[in-house]
Design a protein with these regions (language model features):
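HIT superfamily nucleotide-processing domains
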Residues: 1-186
């Protein structure tokens, strides 16, 4: 029950200069909700590696866009943007330095083709490429090496993730997989 007084008038705002650390030009995007996803990989009920299981499925069921000799490309089940691809070796290795020269070459070649196909099919304006190796580095599946290819557009960030805790993805994963797989060179 309110007594009618304006309690906001008594509130003070602490300036950023009062916090620990040295101010810099970087903005921070704090995502503590991702810790549940990151730490879930360490629990015993996650016995099957999703990147070892995917190639055993049909391309449609595994969301696989393309298969090479030593590596393959699939859609991220939890995409940052529509068309978010992952390039994985078939072998279950956890770090880039464990990859053979053949795997390194094919991961690189599949990444290049993936970028070209995404640019052609989605008209993206840029990419984020990267590998998070180890849970401490933010890898959701830290036991199996995978490279992210995230297509970017100048307008892909909006208020939804901040206000509504929702990421707007305009295409269903199956539709994206079909589009990219059909555009992939044979």
């Amino acid at each position: 029950m309110s007594d009618g007084r304006d309690t906001d008038a008594d509130a003070s705002v602490t300036g950023s200069d009062a916090f620990a650390g040295v101010p810099d030009e970087f903005q921070r995007l704090w995502t503590p909700h991702r810790m549940a996803y990151i730490q879930a990989g360490r629990e015993p009920h996650h016995e099957e590696c999703p990147f070892c299981a995917a190639p055993e499925k049909s391309d449609e069921d595994g969301l696989i866009v393309a298969r090479g000799r030593t590596a393959y490309v699939l859609l991220n089940l939890f995409p940052y943007n529509s068309g978010h691809l992952l390039v994985c070796p078939y072998r279950h290795i956890s770090t880039y330095d464990q990859a053979t020269p053949e795997e390194v070459a094919e991961i690189g070649a599949l990444t290049q083709v993936g970028m070209r196909v995404l640019r052609e099919t989605s008209r993206c304006e840029g990419f984020n490429l990267g590998m998070n190796q180890g849970a401490v580095a933010g890898a959701g599946v830290d036991g199996h090496l995978h490279q992210h290819i995230v297509p970017r557009w100048s307008s892909d960030a909006n208020f939804f993730p901040i206000i509504a805790k929702t990421k707007a993805l305009p295409q269903l994963l199956g539709d994206v997989r079909r589009t990219l797989a059909s555009a992939w060179p044979r």
